[in-house]
């Protein structure tokens, strides 16, 4: 199986992944007990995750188990830190990391954000799939998913 880099992320209708001050409360609009919107099935098909340091710090502050059990997490950072268990802090080039990971056997590679990492991957044409859950909310400001300067890329809507 050819490994894919998959961005799996939620955003508002107007394209924000967080409101002002990194507020994620808009995500609760669609929360339903027992519903994970396909996340559990998705996570079974990946064994590697890539995130930016800010995203890593945010998830850590929420007290969630991260990475999920059995997954390797690469945290892209400008300030190298010692690796810890299934967490590797990586300060090299993103293209080199993706090339290395894709050349190794394994399952798919999940990019969990943040926007800097997603946009770098898109600029380098390294994203194989975008899975975007659109939350029926207009935020008007905050952290935009897509930055300016991205190259034109033809996408195929799957569902």
What do these predicted regions represent?
Residues 1-159:
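Enzymes that bind and transform nitrogen-containing heteroaromatic metabolites
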């Amino acid at each position: 199986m050819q490994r894919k880099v998959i961005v799996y992320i939620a955003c508002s209708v107007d394209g924000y992944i967080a409101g002002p001050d990194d507020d994620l409360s808009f995500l609760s609009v669609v929360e339903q007990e027992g519903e994970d919107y396909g996340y559990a099935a998705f996570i079974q098909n990946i064994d590697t995750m890539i995130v930016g340091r800010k995203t890593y710090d945010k998830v850590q502050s929420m007290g969630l188990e991260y990475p999920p059990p059995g997954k390797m997490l690469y945290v892209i950072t400008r300030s190298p830190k010692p690796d810890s268990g299934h967490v590797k802090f990586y300060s090299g080039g993103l293209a080199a990391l993706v090339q290395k990971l894709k050349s190794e056997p394994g399952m798919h590679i999940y990019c969990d954000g943040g926007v800097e990492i997603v946009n770098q991957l898109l600029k380098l044409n390294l994203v194989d799939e975008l899975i975007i859950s659109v939350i029926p909310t207009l935020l008007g400001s905050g952290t935009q998913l897509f930055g300016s300067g991205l190259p034109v890329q033809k996408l195929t809507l799957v569902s």
